[in-house]
C-alpha cells in the first residue's frame, strides 16, 4: 500500500560504506544579523565580502563614498524611510551597503551585480527606483519611469509586493504589471510610474504602444542567469532595451556569473560598475541538509507520504523533475486524504497566482513544484525543502549524469531566505542519484547527513530535533 512506511535503504552503505549515525551533525556557528527590535534588519547574514570594480579605473572602490552604513545617510525621502521601517529594515545588508551608493549616484551609472536571492538585492534596486521617480503631477505618476524585467510572473509579482511595501507612503505611486495574460484583460494604456513584467509581454506592449517608453529612467534585469537558461528570454531583453531611451540607467543582477552570463551582462549593461560576492557567500550554510535512501521510485513516494506530518509543521516545498511527476504525486496524495497543491509552468497564469497566494498565506502547507519556484520567490514560512528528484544538468545521452549545483542552491535556499535557517531532505534511489548527491557535497564542501529509515519513529524524531535546533540557533522563539 502507498501509505506503508518505506523500506530501510542502504544504498550509501553499498556504494561507499559510510559510518552510520542517528545524531544530527552540529551546524557551524551562524553569524546572524541583529533582530529588527535590536536595530538590525532581520537579515541573518553569513560572513561574506562584497567586491566592487568601478568602471572608472582611476577611482578607488574602497573610498568611503562607495559604502553606506545607514539608510539615513543616503538622503532619502522621509516617506521612503518610512517604507523601509515598515519592512523592518533598520540598516543596510552587506550587499546594500555597497550597491546603494553605486546605484543612487548622479549622474546615474550602470551596475552589474552578483547576488543570490535572499541578500537584499531586490530592496536595493527598488530603493534606487523609488528615489528617482518624479511623482509631482498626475501625468508623471501615470507615465512609466522605471522598468523591471523578471523571468517569471511569480518573481514579477513578488517584486511588485516589495515596491508596494517600500513605497506605501509615497503619494501617487502607481505600479503596473506586464505579464502573460488573456489579451482581453490587458489595459489599453499602461498608466504606471513603475512597470514590472516579463520580457515578451513588455516588448509586445511597447510595440503596440500600450506602454510608452520615452520617459523611462531605469531598467532592471533580475535573475539574468535564469533568463539565459530559458529559451529566447535573453534575446527578448536585448530587444526590449533597444526600444528604450539611450541614456537609461541599466541594472543587471545575476546569482551566478559563468562566462556566457558575463558576456551578456557586458552587452546589456556596458561600462557598468561591478559588484560581486566572494565565493564563500555562495554556500549552503545555515540550512541543515539531510538525505534519505529509498529502494525505488515507488519507495520515494511512500517516503514522502510518511513525511507528510513533518511537512506541515511549517510550510514545505517538494521539488520534482517534471510537470507530470508533480501532477501525479498531487493526485495520489490528495486521493489518500492529504492536503497538497502543485505548481508548474503548465498551469495558467492566474491560477498560478492563486496557488502562490494560498501557499504564502499558509492556507496550503505543502507545495509540489518543478523549478518554477527555484529562484527568487520569498515564502518566509518555508521550513523544509524536499528534493524528491535531485536537480541535474541536461546532458547528452552518452554522458554521465551531472548535478545542477546552482539549482540545488536555489532550491534549498527556499528554507534560508534572508539568512533564516531550515531543513532540506534529498531522496536518493539509485547509484546515479547518490553520485550526484556526492558531487553536490564536494562542490559546496559540505556534509549531507544520511538518515536511516529502518526505524521511522527515529527518523521523525531526528528531523523534528533538527528543525527545533536550527530554529534555536537562528534565535527563533
Swiss-Prot record:
A motif (DEAD box) lies at residues 222-225. Pfam families: DEAD (PF00270), Helicase_C (PF00271). Belongs to the DEAD box helicase family. DDX19/DBP5 subfamily. It comes from the Eukaryota. This is ATP-dependent RNA helicase dbp5. Residues 102-275 form the Helicase ATP-binding domain. ATP-dependent RNA helicase associated with the nuclear pore complex and essential for mRNA export from the nucleus. May participate in a terminal step of mRNA export through the removal of proteins that accompany mRNA through the nucleopore complex. May also be involved in early transcription. GO terms for molecular function: ATP binding; ATP hydrolysis activity; inositol hexakisphosphate binding; mRNA binding; RNA helicase activity. Residues 1-43 are annotated as: Disordered. CDD domains: DEADc_DDX19_DDX25, SF2_C_DEAD. It comes from Emericella nidulans (strain FGSC A4 / ATCC 38163 / CBS 112.46 / NRRL 194 / M139) (Aspergillus nidulans). SUPFAM superfamilies: P-loop containing nucleoside triphosphate hydrolases (SSF52540). The Q motif is unique to and characteristic of the DEAD box family of RNA helicases and controls ATP binding and hydrolysis. Residues 303-459 form the Helicase C-terminal domain. GO terms for cellular component: cellular bud tip; cytoplasmic stress granule; nuclear membrane; nuclear pore cytoplasmic filaments; nucleus. Associates with the nuclear pore complex.
